[in-house]
A protein has these predicted regions:
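Surface-exposed, low-hydrophobicity beta-strand/loop segments enriched in small/polar/acidic residues
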Residues: 1-169
């Protein structure tokens, strides 16, 4: 089910030089929500509620880009693609774990995670129909055992793998 309001997403770790925010244009008239997975299609942000295999995951949507006030839920694109921008936080974040065949376990650490929807990552590409979300790091229960609010969640380094010289951080 598509989001209808902003959500709270928790970062894992401390932001540093490798997790600088990026700014991307929003697709014309599209609405994306703070705290959701930031995906682009044809170069512009779209809601990850119905991801496509060619989408690119960047991080978590944080706020409007320069020139726009953050006063209402959601970020709405302008009359043309990219005329309104969003700031995206990069790095590792706690996301909802997929279910069934899409559920991660600790044994899957280091595996590729795929975008299921705005707040959920899973273990399968669903027949190559889902975009890469990033790298599954571990279960929240192992990384933050004293955080009951994160129960059942996973940590994903969001972004596209780039071999040994870069990629998700």
């Amino acid at each position: 089910m598509a989001l209808t309001a902003d959500v709270r997403t928790t970062r894992y770790g401390t932001p540093g030089n490798s997790t600088q925010p990026v700014n991307r244009g929003i697709t014309a008239a599209a609405t994306v929500y703070r705290g959701s997975i930031a995906t682009t299609r044809s170069g512009y942000l779209v809601a990850a509620s119905a991801p496509q295999s060619g989408d690119i995951a960047w991080g978590i949507i944080d706020k409007y880009g320069p020139g726009y006030a953050d006063v209402a839920p959601g970020l709405v694109g302008g009359t043309s693609n990219g005329s309104v921008t969003a700031e995206i936080q990069t790095g590792s974040f706690f996301l909802q774990n997929g279910s069934g065949a899409d559920a991660f376990t600790a044994a899957n650490a280091g595996a590729t995670a795929y975008v299921i929807n705005e707040t959920t990552a899973g273990a399968t590409s669903n027949g190559n129909t889902r975009p890469v979300c990033g790298e599954f790091t571990d279960m929240a229960a192992n990384l933050a055992p004293n955080r009951p609010d994160l129960a059942g969640m996973i940590v994903v380094k969001i972004g596209q793998p780039a071999g040994s010289t870069g990629g998700p951080s």
